[in-house]
Amino acid sequence: MADQPVQVNKLKTKITKGDMFKTFVFENFQQASFNFERIHALAFCVDMIPTIKRVYSKKEDQVAALKRHLVFFNTTPAMCGPIVGVTMALEEGRAAGEPIDDGTINSFKVGLMGPLAGVGDPLMWGTLRPILAALGASLALQGSWLGPILFFVAFNAVRLSLKWYGLQLGFSRGLALVKDMSGNLLQKITEGATVLGLFIMGILVTKWTTINVPLVVSKTTVNGKTTVTTLQNILDQFCPGLLALGWTLLCMYLLRKKVSPILLIFALFGVGIVGYWLGILK
Protein backbone atom coordinates (compact mmCIF):
# COMPACT_ATOMS: atom_id res chain seq x y z
CA MET A 1 0.00 0.00 0.00
CA ALA A 2 2.78 2.44 0.93
CA ASP A 3 4.51 1.95 -2.45
CA GLN A 4 1.42 2.69 -4.53
CA PRO A 5 1.70 5.93 -6.53
CA VAL A 6 -0.39 8.87 -5.38
CA GLN A 7 -3.20 9.80 -7.79
CA VAL A 8 -2.90 13.44 -8.89
CA ASN A 9 -5.64 14.73 -11.18
CA LYS A 10 -6.20 11.12 -12.32
CA LEU A 11 -2.54 10.87 -13.39
CA LYS A 12 0.03 8.65 -11.72
CA THR A 13 3.18 10.13 -10.29
CA LYS A 14 6.37 8.57 -9.00
CA ILE A 15 5.61 9.84 -5.49
CA THR A 16 4.15 7.04 -3.39
CA LYS A 17 1.89 7.19 -0.36
CA GLY A 18 4.87 6.11 1.71
CA ASP A 19 6.88 9.08 0.42
CA MET A 20 4.02 11.40 1.26
CA PHE A 21 3.74 10.05 4.80
CA LYS A 22 7.50 10.27 5.39
CA THR A 23 7.44 13.87 4.22
CA PHE A 24 4.56 14.60 6.61
CA VAL A 25 6.52 13.09 9.51
CA PHE A 26 9.62 15.12 8.64
CA GLU A 27 7.50 18.28 8.52
CA ASN A 28 6.90 18.00 12.25
CA PHE A 29 10.57 18.75 12.97
CA GLN A 30 10.56 22.11 11.23
CA GLN A 31 12.09 23.89 14.23
CA ALA A 32 14.67 21.21 15.06
CA SER A 33 17.44 22.81 12.99
CA PHE A 34 16.46 26.44 13.55
CA ASN A 35 19.28 28.93 13.12
CA PHE A 36 19.42 32.68 12.54
CA GLU A 37 21.26 32.38 9.24
CA ARG A 38 18.78 30.33 7.20
CA ILE A 39 15.98 29.68 9.75
CA HIS A 40 14.19 26.49 8.51
CA ALA A 41 16.36 25.78 5.46
CA LEU A 42 17.90 22.52 6.68
CA ALA A 43 14.53 21.22 7.89
CA PHE A 44 12.97 21.97 4.50
CA CYS A 45 15.85 20.14 2.84
CA VAL A 46 15.13 17.09 5.01
CA ASP A 47 11.42 17.34 4.09
CA MET A 48 12.39 16.95 0.44
CA ILE A 49 14.56 13.83 0.89
CA PRO A 50 11.80 11.24 0.16
CA THR A 51 10.79 13.08 -3.02
CA ILE A 52 14.35 13.65 -4.23
CA LYS A 53 15.26 10.00 -3.71
CA ARG A 54 12.14 8.93 -5.57
CA VAL A 55 12.32 11.15 -8.65
CA TYR A 56 16.10 11.37 -9.19
CA SER A 57 17.99 8.16 -9.91
CA LYS A 58 21.48 9.64 -10.29
CA LYS A 59 23.48 10.46 -7.18
CA GLU A 60 24.73 13.78 -8.57
CA ASP A 61 21.16 14.89 -9.33
CA GLN A 62 20.11 14.05 -5.79
CA VAL A 63 23.02 16.02 -4.33
CA ALA A 64 22.25 19.03 -6.53
CA ALA A 65 18.58 18.93 -5.53
CA LEU A 66 19.41 18.79 -1.82
CA LYS A 67 21.79 21.74 -2.15
CA ARG A 68 19.04 23.62 -3.96
CA HIS A 69 16.92 23.54 -0.81
CA LEU A 70 19.59 24.78 1.60
CA VAL A 71 18.74 28.41 0.86
CA PHE A 72 16.94 30.65 3.35
CA PHE A 73 13.44 29.50 4.23
CA ASN A 74 11.10 30.83 6.90
CA THR A 75 7.37 30.43 7.42
CA THR A 76 4.96 29.38 10.16
CA PRO A 77 5.77 25.69 10.78
CA ALA A 78 2.12 24.66 10.66
CA MET A 79 1.74 26.28 7.23
CA CYS A 80 4.73 24.71 5.48
CA GLY A 81 2.65 21.86 3.99
CA PRO A 82 1.44 23.66 0.84
CA ILE A 83 4.95 24.94 0.11
CA VAL A 84 6.49 21.49 0.51
CA GLY A 85 3.74 19.99 -1.66
CA VAL A 86 4.20 22.50 -4.48
CA THR A 87 7.97 22.04 -4.33
CA MET A 88 7.55 18.26 -4.56
CA ALA A 89 5.48 18.71 -7.73
CA LEU A 90 8.10 21.08 -9.18
CA GLU A 91 10.94 18.67 -8.41
CA GLU A 92 9.10 15.81 -10.05
CA GLY A 93 8.40 17.95 -13.10
CA ARG A 94 12.06 18.94 -13.34
CA ALA A 95 13.16 15.31 -13.03
CA ALA A 96 10.75 14.44 -15.85
CA GLY A 97 12.41 16.98 -18.14
CA GLU A 98 10.16 20.00 -17.68
CA PRO A 99 11.91 23.40 -18.12
CA ILE A 100 12.04 24.17 -14.39
CA ASP A 101 15.29 25.67 -13.12
CA ASP A 102 16.62 26.42 -9.63
CA GLY A 103 15.36 29.99 -9.76
CA THR A 104 11.81 28.89 -10.55
CA ILE A 105 11.67 26.46 -7.64
CA ASN A 106 13.11 28.96 -5.16
CA SER A 107 10.84 31.71 -6.47
CA PHE A 108 7.78 29.63 -5.69
CA LYS A 109 9.08 28.88 -2.20
CA VAL A 110 9.78 32.53 -1.47
CA GLY A 111 6.51 33.64 -3.02
CA LEU A 112 4.49 31.31 -0.80
CA MET A 113 6.37 31.40 2.48
CA GLY A 114 5.66 35.09 3.12
CA PRO A 115 1.87 35.10 2.55
CA LEU A 116 1.41 31.80 4.39
CA ALA A 117 3.40 33.13 7.35
CA GLY A 118 1.18 36.21 7.26
CA VAL A 119 -1.82 33.94 7.75
CA GLY A 120 -0.18 31.32 9.96
CA ASP A 121 1.31 33.63 12.58
CA PRO A 122 -1.94 35.41 13.54
CA LEU A 123 -3.94 32.21 13.11
CA MET A 124 -1.71 29.85 15.11
CA TRP A 125 0.19 32.08 17.54
CA GLY A 126 -2.15 35.07 17.80
CA THR A 127 -5.53 33.33 17.82
CA LEU A 128 -5.57 29.55 18.23
CA ARG A 129 -2.87 29.18 20.89
CA PRO A 130 -4.13 31.98 23.20
CA ILE A 131 -7.74 30.79 22.92
CA LEU A 132 -6.93 27.15 23.62
CA ALA A 133 -4.47 28.11 26.37
CA ALA A 134 -7.14 30.28 27.98
CA LEU A 135 -9.69 27.48 27.85
CA GLY A 136 -7.18 24.99 29.21
CA ALA A 137 -6.06 27.37 31.96
CA SER A 138 -9.68 28.03 32.95
CA LEU A 139 -10.24 24.30 33.42
CA ALA A 140 -6.95 23.95 35.28
CA LEU A 141 -7.87 26.79 37.65
CA GLN A 142 -11.01 24.85 38.50
CA GLY A 143 -8.87 21.86 39.43
CA SER A 144 -9.59 19.84 36.29
CA TRP A 145 -6.79 17.77 34.78
CA LEU A 146 -8.49 18.11 31.40
CA GLY A 147 -7.08 21.64 31.00
CA PRO A 148 -3.58 20.80 29.71
CA ILE A 149 -4.90 17.78 27.79
CA LEU A 150 -7.46 19.96 26.00
CA PHE A 151 -4.78 22.45 25.00
CA PHE A 152 -2.31 19.78 23.84
CA VAL A 153 -4.81 17.67 21.89
CA ALA A 154 -6.77 20.52 20.28
CA PHE A 155 -3.71 22.55 19.27
CA ASN A 156 -1.92 19.58 17.76
CA ALA A 157 -5.06 18.37 16.00
CA VAL A 158 -5.26 21.67 14.14
CA ARG A 159 -1.50 21.80 13.56
CA LEU A 160 -1.28 18.27 12.16
CA SER A 161 -4.38 18.75 10.02
CA LEU A 162 -2.90 21.88 8.45
CA LYS A 163 0.36 20.07 7.75
CA TRP A 164 -1.21 16.93 6.27
CA TYR A 165 -3.99 18.45 4.20
CA GLY A 166 -1.79 21.39 3.22
CA LEU A 167 0.80 18.94 1.91
CA GLN A 168 -1.86 17.05 -0.04
CA LEU A 169 -3.31 20.27 -1.43
CA GLY A 170 0.04 21.67 -2.43
CA PHE A 171 1.08 18.51 -4.23
CA SER A 172 -2.24 17.80 -5.95
CA ARG A 173 -2.85 21.34 -7.14
CA GLY A 174 0.78 22.11 -7.91
CA LEU A 175 1.13 25.38 -9.75
CA ALA A 176 -2.62 26.07 -9.55
CA LEU A 177 -2.30 26.56 -5.77
CA VAL A 178 -0.15 29.64 -6.28
CA LYS A 179 -2.89 31.26 -8.36
CA ASP A 180 -5.45 30.52 -5.63
CA MET A 181 -3.22 32.01 -2.97
CA SER A 182 -2.60 35.17 -4.98
CA GLY A 183 -6.21 36.30 -4.68
CA ASN A 184 -8.12 37.69 -1.70
CA LEU A 185 -8.30 34.36 0.12
CA LEU A 186 -5.33 35.04 2.38
CA GLN A 187 -6.55 38.53 3.23
CA LYS A 188 -10.01 37.24 4.14
CA ILE A 189 -8.58 34.48 6.34
CA THR A 190 -6.31 36.95 8.10
CA GLU A 191 -9.13 39.43 8.69
CA GLY A 192 -11.41 36.69 10.01
CA ALA A 193 -8.73 35.35 12.35
CA THR A 194 -8.00 38.87 13.62
CA VAL A 195 -11.66 39.64 14.34
CA LEU A 196 -12.15 36.31 16.11
CA GLY A 197 -8.99 36.80 18.14
CA LEU A 198 -10.01 40.30 19.22
CA PHE A 199 -13.48 39.06 20.16
CA ILE A 200 -12.11 36.27 22.34
CA MET A 201 -9.47 38.48 23.95
CA GLY A 202 -12.15 41.04 24.76
CA ILE A 203 -14.07 38.33 26.61
CA LEU A 204 -10.96 37.22 28.47
CA VAL A 205 -10.19 40.79 29.58
CA THR A 206 -13.42 40.97 31.58
CA LYS A 207 -13.03 37.40 32.85
CA TRP A 208 -9.42 37.48 34.01
CA THR A 209 -8.72 41.16 34.76
CA THR A 210 -10.27 42.24 38.05
CA ILE A 211 -10.04 45.80 39.35
CA ASN A 212 -12.14 46.66 42.40
CA VAL A 213 -12.23 50.23 43.76
CA PRO A 214 -13.90 50.01 47.22
CA LEU A 215 -13.97 53.77 47.86
CA VAL A 216 -17.26 54.62 49.60
CA VAL A 217 -19.31 57.25 47.80
CA SER A 218 -22.41 57.24 50.00
CA LYS A 219 -24.18 55.47 52.83
CA THR A 220 -27.95 55.40 53.14
CA THR A 221 -30.00 53.90 55.93
CA VAL A 222 -33.56 52.79 55.26
CA ASN A 223 -35.62 50.95 57.89
CA GLY A 224 -32.48 50.27 59.86
CA LYS A 225 -30.68 48.75 56.88
CA THR A 226 -27.55 50.54 55.68
CA THR A 227 -26.69 50.47 52.00
CA VAL A 228 -23.13 51.32 51.05
CA THR A 229 -22.47 52.59 47.54
CA THR A 230 -18.89 52.36 46.35
CA LEU A 231 -17.21 53.83 43.33
CA GLN A 232 -17.02 50.32 41.90
CA ASN A 233 -20.80 49.94 42.13
CA ILE A 234 -21.29 53.12 40.12
CA LEU A 235 -18.77 52.08 37.48
CA ASP A 236 -20.36 48.63 37.16
CA GLN A 237 -23.77 50.19 36.61
CA PHE A 238 -22.34 52.47 33.96
CA CYS A 239 -20.22 49.84 32.16
CA PRO A 240 -19.13 46.55 33.77
CA GLY A 241 -15.44 45.89 33.29
CA LEU A 242 -14.69 49.50 32.32
CA LEU A 243 -11.56 49.76 34.47
CA ALA A 244 -10.26 46.40 33.26
CA LEU A 245 -10.74 47.48 29.65
CA GLY A 246 -9.11 50.86 30.25
CA TRP A 247 -6.13 49.28 32.01
CA THR A 248 -5.71 46.74 29.20
CA LEU A 249 -5.82 49.44 26.53
CA LEU A 250 -3.27 51.47 28.49
CA CYS A 251 -0.91 48.49 28.62
CA MET A 252 -1.36 47.91 24.88
CA TYR A 253 -0.59 51.57 24.20
CA LEU A 254 2.58 51.43 26.30
CA LEU A 255 3.69 48.22 24.58
CA ARG A 256 3.26 49.89 21.19
CA LYS A 257 5.41 52.73 22.50
CA LYS A 258 8.17 50.13 23.05
CA VAL A 259 7.83 50.12 26.84
CA SER A 260 9.43 46.95 28.20
CA PRO A 261 6.91 44.20 29.11
CA ILE A 262 9.05 43.40 32.17
CA LEU A 263 8.76 47.01 33.30
CA LEU A 264 4.98 46.86 32.86
CA ILE A 265 4.75 43.69 34.94
CA PHE A 266 6.66 45.26 37.82
CA ALA A 267 4.55 48.42 37.46
CA LEU A 268 1.37 46.33 37.76
CA PHE A 269 2.72 44.71 40.91
CA GLY A 270 3.61 48.13 42.32
CA VAL A 271 0.25 49.71 41.55
CA GLY A 272 -1.59 46.73 43.02
CA ILE A 273 0.43 46.67 46.24
CA VAL A 274 0.36 50.44 46.81
CA GLY A 275 -3.30 50.67 45.84
CA TYR A 276 -4.26 47.95 48.31
CA TRP A 277 -2.15 49.55 51.07
CA LEU A 278 -3.88 52.92 50.52
CA GLY A 279 -7.31 51.29 50.40
CA ILE A 280 -7.92 52.41 46.82
CA LEU A 281 -7.87 48.91 45.36
CA LYS A 282 -9.16 45.63 46.67
Swiss-Prot record:
Domain of life of the source: Bacteria
Domain notes: The EIID domain, with its homologous EIIC domain, forms the PTS system translocation channel and contains part of its specific substrate-binding site.
Cystine crosslinks: none
Boundaries of every PTS EIID domain copy: 13-281
Subcellular location as annotated: Cell membrane
Entries under PROSITE patterns matching the protein: PTS_EIID
Gene from which the chain derives: sorD
Transmembrane residue ranges: 135-155, 197-217, 234-254, 261-281
GO biological process, one term: phosphoenolpyruvate-dependent sugar phosphotransferase system
GO CC annotation, single: plasma membrane
Protein function: The phosphoenolpyruvate-dependent sugar phosphotransferase system (PTS), a major carbohydrate active transport system, catalyzes the phosphorylation of incoming sugar substrates concomitant with their translocation across the cell membrane. The enzyme II SorABCD PTS system is involved in L-sorbose transport.
Name of the protein in its database record: PTS system sorbose-specific EIID component
Membrane-topology descriptor: Multi-pass membrane protein
Keywords: Cell membrane, Membrane, Phosphotransferase system, Sugar transport, Transmembrane, Transmembrane helix, Transport
NCBIfam families: EIID-AGA (TIGR00828), PRK11103.1 (NF008315)
Induction: Induced by L-sorbose and repressed by D-glucose.
